[in-house]
């Protein structure tokens, strides 16, 4: 999207997560004001006005991103999805943002069908609503215009920037993990198990463990992996953790080891000063309780 935008236009009335986030992304990329009203024919025909979630048209060449005109049996999709697709980020967003597909379902199918698709009771949808969602959406809906420098616009820019940065950086992060990690097979008295070890680098990433679970998914090893080992960003040693709450690892079993300075009481994470891979494997072996 290299077009110079004059402004972003979305529907008046109640705001929803999809149009809010779509506006956040475009505000972060273009730094322009956001208007909340019905579009004119001239605005729909203008490639310098982004029309979000209103207008009855999906015309990326004119920056029109509405989905309400799609047939009832169309795959669940929302205005945020259409914007991300136009930016070439949709596939990565669907891979990296677990919340995106439920958001598409909620906007296109409503809470009842979304609950059935998720396999939960209808009331669970309401139980997951955050006061942050309520406040941001209400404040966004309250005003007909939001300009750079104003509180809500600046918050939206930050949200959009964080989302874009996360999507764009995670792809690079997965490549980094592929270059600097090793897959371990650890032998223990209860049998063998798999762990992913991320080597320490200089400089160290700000969140060393970020993306490791996604990397395991990408390798197709989700059903095989048991533990993760990664550099401790607060010290010179390593963190050890269960892979997605795998019940085979209980790190309270290594809490009394002399080189372990922290083990969570629930056993899902521990920190050690050890750096020798052989010792790290031994700590995992001691923590393993079986499949």
Predicted features along the sequence, with ranges:
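Generic marker of "main functional regions" within proteins
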Residues: 18, 27-31, 36, 61-62, ...
């Amino acid at each position: 999207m290299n077009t110079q935008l004059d402004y972003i236009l979305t529907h008046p009335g109640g705001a929803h997560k999809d149009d809010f986030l779509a506006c956040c992304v475009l505000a972060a990329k273009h730094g322009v004001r956001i208007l909340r009203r019905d579009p004119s024919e001239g605005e729909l025909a203008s490639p310098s006005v982004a029309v979000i979630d209103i207008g009855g048209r999906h015309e990326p060449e004119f920056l029109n991103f509405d989905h309400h005109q799609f047939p009832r049996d169309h795959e669940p999709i929302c205005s945020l999805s259409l914007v991300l697709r136009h930016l070439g980020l949709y596939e990565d967003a669907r891979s990296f943002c677990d919340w995106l597909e439920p958001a598409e379902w909620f906007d296109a199918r409503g809470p009842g069908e979304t609950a059935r698709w998720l396999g939960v009771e209808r009331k669970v949808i309401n139980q997951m609503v955050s006061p942050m969602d309520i406040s941001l959406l209400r404040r966004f809906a309250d005003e007909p215009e939001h300009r750079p420098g104003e509180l809500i616009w600046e918050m939206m820019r930050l949200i959009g920037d964080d989302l874009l940065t996360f999507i764009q950086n995670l792809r690079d992060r997965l490549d980094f993990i592929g270059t600097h990690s090793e897959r371990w097979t650890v032998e223990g008295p209860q049998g063998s198990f798999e762990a992913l070890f991320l080597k320490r680098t200089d400089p160290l990433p700000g969140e060393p463990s970020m993306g490791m679970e996604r990397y395991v998914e990408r390798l197709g090893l989700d059903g095989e992996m048991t533990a993760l080992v990664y550099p401790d960003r607060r010290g010179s040693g390593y963190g050890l953790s269960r892979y997605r709450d795998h019940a085979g690892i209980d790190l309270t079993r290594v809490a009394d080891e002399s080189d372990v300075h922290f083990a969570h009481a629930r056993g899902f994470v521990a920190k050690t000063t050890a750096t020798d891979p052989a010792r790290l494997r031994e700590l995992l072996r001691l923590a393993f309780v079986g499949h």
